[in-house]
């Protein structure tokens, strides 16, 4: 407990939040749980100043832009809200619609997809989680900002420890250069032991790119031919456990139809890790590059006429139907040594 200059009591949890915010304001490399501050008169000013700033940061929206792109991000979930071409004034990012999917571009951490019965194990204990983990529902702090770069950070709390029992800082970093948007994920392990986690992106794109045209005019095109596999889904929207060859059409293409998603996401493995979303008889398209991600999920709302498609780079798969996994021993989970950091990225490029 701490009293400010007006003798108002500052609750312990709020004080922790203030310190975390202040630490991230100073540097994105600080370990917030080790900062020690003497609450002198200077400390009183410090707390009040950053308390006001921390509260002001909730549910905020930030933009970055250059000559070609304008990108918007909100602090809840550090979620993309807009990817707009300044050249053609085209909004490429799905803008959310309750009828189909209200999200736009979730960041997935520390799990990808669904857990069996929304539960998973970690070091002998069972935890309950929403699909895609904790990042999507939590407020991030703006840790750093320039004209073309935004860095957001989520630090563990008592609430997150009840869902994912590890101390961490999860950074989501957006940077634009030319017609490219780079989305980086950085996980900082604050534990004195190894931790396990999964990562992924979930950006949705308007299809068609503009009001004219039909969904079926579009297709995916991989940059190289590989022996692509499809991880089949079960009616529960979990993985069935069956992996089958997937036959590409000519020129390494996958035609888009609404029927393609009747069983939920189409999950690809063994891709070349570069795919473009294109339209027939058009030179306008976008390219997703995901060099460190083993899987690509392609999704829209099943059994709908939804005018969007999500291209989702994943490090790991959702749960297999009927099986509750242990995250630490999951065969495709990422592992991070004590007090170390892991960083990866995917990149989006617009072609107009």
Outline where the language-model segments fall:
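Acidic, contiguous internal or C-terminal segments within carbohydrate-active enzymes
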Residues: 156-209
